[in-house]
Amino acid sequence: MSPPVFRLAGSAALSLSFAACSEPEPRKSTPSETHAEPTDSGQVDSGEVADAVLPVVEGLAPALDLDDSPGVVEVELVASTATVSWVDDSDTEVWAYNGQVPGPLIQAHVGDTLRVHFTNDLDEPTTIHWHGLRISDQMDGVPAIQDPVEPGESFTYEFALPDAGTFWYHPHVRTNVAVEMGLQGMLVVHDPADVAVTERAFVVDDVLMQGTRIDPRTMDHMSQVHGRHGNMLLVNGETDLLTATVRAGTAERWRIVNTANARTMWVSVTNASWRVIAVDGTLLHTPFEVERGLLPVGQRLDLEVIPLDGAETVGLQVELPDGTGGFSEYPVFAGTVEGDQAAPGWTEWGAPALAEPRESLQEGTLLLNGEGGGTSVEWMINGEVYGEHTPLELDAHTPTVITIKDRSRAEHPFHLHGQFFRILDRNGEVLPEDAGLRDTVLVEGSDLLRLYTELENPGRWMAHCHILEHAELGMMTEMIVSE
């Protein structure tokens, strides 16, 4: 199967101008937005963790746990160059963790300590950012806060895992180059109380191939404006259709992350009943069904999938706008259904409803805008590029409303480090698909979003657009959350 090549007429034709400044009751696997410290939230009794066995998550090679002690997961990651054969059996140089793209699947239980011995065998500095994890800012992988790992050097990341969910890891130095070259991987934190079902992992990416090469080091005008959109679709580092066996009459949990530099994607499932049960890893009190699930850059969706009675195959497909108002479908996984058991009802996941937001005691505003043309585009927050920015200073453990206003007429998948938030409203509307806790949200052209958070995790935290070229060109700032 040849790699899918995307038709970009829709995005290329966009003229960007810059303006001035009866569902089942689910079960809990991640904390609600309460007053608990993140290092305490969601932890389980150590005996329970010790007795629990990590589920098998199919689709990705797992990292080797070097420590068999209960409550500790210890792995090694090495960033280096490697080669893959994505085009005509020719070698393409990539950057890889442990020689593979994506990197190995890291798994642990909520409450475990994760210890990662990282070695940088690249010829430039790098870090590892743990996207979505509420950990210490000293382990967050941001170079303004901790020193990057220099070529030939090593560093050990170590932290407790306060929250269950689907997360991922990637560098935070020249991120647009490093992620495009292949430095990315999934991290799954399990709650022993979760319903035991078959789990599958899908890391969805697109890369811009120039013949047999990837060369993200320079940005033309289109990449500066829209971000780097690829012409080859990868799922779990493969260009071919993934296949597996799926049992009839059973539910599965599919964990999906969009690790692309810039492309918003949608996903859908064929020959199955399916619904979204978690966003950014956190289980929803009320899962929802949609025709296609929106998956912005950096975000994660967990799907519950049940094969239809009599189905011979179940498929996952990525859907992309076709430039005419419709969608083109790209099949990426085909599961052959075995057995003849009848389809069950929906699983009761048991996530509790979130507590009602308390009255806001402080507010922050993030205005997203850009200016320039040709090959000198700047993307800004509150009229400032990163490095010349004014941090947002906020008190920890305080009900907070953060307003995000997009003045650029472009879309921005916006990510907050170190915190969870919920979407109060989008352009004055409360939408079912905006439910739950998350760390990333898609802000579309001219959107006005209000986010609610209680800032449970003190520290210096990045807030930025996850279109990696936008971030590289300035659309980053800091939130200083003080005790």
Language-model features: where?
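N-terminal edge beta-strand
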Residues: 84-110, 230-245, 373-399
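Ser/Thr-rich, Pro/Gly/Ala-heavy low-complexity intrinsically disordered linkers and tails
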Residues: 1, 20-51
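Extracytoplasmic beta-sandwich strand-turn segments characteristic of Greek-key/jelly-roll folds
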Residues: 101-108, 114-117, 130-163, 239-244, ...
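Acidic-aromatic/histidine active-site loop/patch
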Residues: 199-250, 257-260, 371, 377-384
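Sec-dependent bacterial lipoprotein signal peptides
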Residues: 1-19
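Extended terminal and domain-junction accessory segments
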Residues: 50-76, 179-213, 285-411, 454-460, ...
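Hydrophobic or amphipathic alpha-helical targeting/insertion segments
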Residues: 153, 157-194
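Asparagine-centered strand-capping/turn motif at beta-strand->loop junctions
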Residues: 118-122, 256-259, 404-408
